[in-house]
Structure formats: structure tokens, C-alpha cells
């Protein structure tokens, strides 16, 4: 620290920087996943920095997991030895919407399908939010293709909004007379269609996240040079 304090600044200023440098180095060595998650979260408004730090994390052997409606939190989070993308990184996701999603999940359990998510969050989300979550991979956990979900999400939202309006006006619907288990069987189905071509899928992903997460367009050329 004494040697560091001799460099350019007055001693008190340089000593403070030295302390921060040593603390940061300690955290990076002993708590690498937590440190990188915090570091990436600190620059979510700077896409180029997010990409830079994600690359650095991967070079450290840390996997970056995509957004997940049942696992993501607002910031980049620690999940075992991996880092999970946070909702803050998704284009058009505001803090009130993120808070509402996490609270709904905490109070009433995980979402079991995209339609379940849309139905439970109909008063908070809009079509753009759902579109961006689809393209970010947030619903991949349900086993549907992103292309299939893009094909049907608008109709799901329109249906959920109508149900909400009917509930407010006191009108009854078929869903009022069936059990929770039966409601799941009556859900609008996501069509089982082929996924987007890899390059198209990744470009759409990058459009809403600012970075590639589940792959890279040049992956197939790895090892050719």
C-alpha cells in the first residue's frame, strides 16, 4: 500500500484507492461468482460493459444462464456456481413490473406455463413486455419454442384482459366453474412448431438483451482458426 500511495495522488487519496483495490481483488479471488454478478449488475444500463463483463465471467469458467420467469430476480443473481440474467437487463422491463412479477411468484408459487404467467400478470404486463420476455428466453423453461410462443402470445393476452374485464363487471365465465387442475387443461396451447433458425433466434435475443446469451452466431466456426 505504501508503494501504491507514492503514485501520482496525495497519500490519503491513494491509500483509499489501494484499500479498495485490495478488497476488490480479495472478493474476485474468493467469491468470483458473487463478485461478477454484482459487477455486471452495476452496469446494466451500459450494454457494451455488460457484454465485456459477461465475457470475462465466462473466461473465469462461470456460466451465464438466461432470464427465467421462475428464477430471475431484478439484478443478475447467483445460482450455484452460475450467474442468472436479471429482469433489469430485458428491454422495456420497468421496476414496477419486475417487482410485481417477483411478488406474484413469491406469494402464489411458480408460473407453470406462459398462459399462467399472462393470466396472473394481466393487470401489470403489456404485449411488448411479453414479447421481449419470450425473445429473451424467459419462458424456455416450459418447453415451447420461442417461435411457437410468438405465434400465440397476443391472443393469450387478449383473452386474459377480457377475463379480467368480465370479472370486474361481475360476468361469469367457463373458468369460474372448473377446478384449478381443469383450468390448466383448458389453456390455449402453444403451437408445436419449429424454432427460429439459430441466427435469427440469437439476433432477436440480442435485440432485447443487448448481448448474446444462449449462443453466438460464430459458435459453429470455433476451432477453425
Where are these regions (language model features)?
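Noncatalytic, beta-rich nucleic-acid-contacting surfaces in large DNA/RNA-processing enzymes
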Residues: 1-225
Amino acid at each position: 500500500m505504501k508503494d501504491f500511495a507514492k503514485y501520482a495522488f496525495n497519500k490519503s487519496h491513494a491509500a483509499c484507492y489501494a484499500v479498495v483495490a485490495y478488497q476488490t481483488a480479495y472478493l474476485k479471488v474468493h467469491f468470483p461468482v458473487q463478485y461478477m454478478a454484482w459487477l455486471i449488475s452495476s452496469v446494466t444500463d451500459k450494454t457494451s460493459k455488460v457484454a465485456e463483463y459477461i465475457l470475462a465471467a465466462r473466461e473465469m469458467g462461470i456460466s451465464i444462464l438466461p432470464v427465467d420467469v421462475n428464477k430471475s430476480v431484478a439484478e443478475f443473481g447467483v445460482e450455484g456456481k452460475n450467474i442468472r440474467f436479471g429482469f433489469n437487463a430485458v428491454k422495456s422491463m420497468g421496476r414496477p413490473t419486475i417487482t410485481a412479477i417477483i411478488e406474484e411468484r413469491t406469494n402464489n408459487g411458480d408460473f407453470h406455463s406462459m398462459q399462467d404467467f399472462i393470466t396472473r400478470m394481466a393487470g401489470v404486463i403489456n404485449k411488448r413486455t411479453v414479447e421481449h420476455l419470450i425473445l429473451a428466453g424467459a419462458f424456455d423453461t416450459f418447453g415451447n419454442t420461442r417461435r411457437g410462443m410468438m405465434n400465440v402470445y397476443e391472443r393469450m393476452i387478449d383473452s386474459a384482459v377480457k377475463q379480467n374485464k368480465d370479472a370486474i363487471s361481475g360476468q361469469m365465465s367457463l373458468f369460474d366453474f372448473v377446478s384449478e387442475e381443469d383450468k390448466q387443461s383448458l389453456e390455449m396451447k402453444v403451437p408445436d412448431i419449429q424454432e427460429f433458425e439459430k441466427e435469427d433466434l440469437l439476433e432477436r435475443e440480442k435485440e432485447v438483451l443487448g448481448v448474446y446469451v444462449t449462443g453466438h452466431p460464430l459458435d459453429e466456426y470455433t476451432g477453425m482458426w
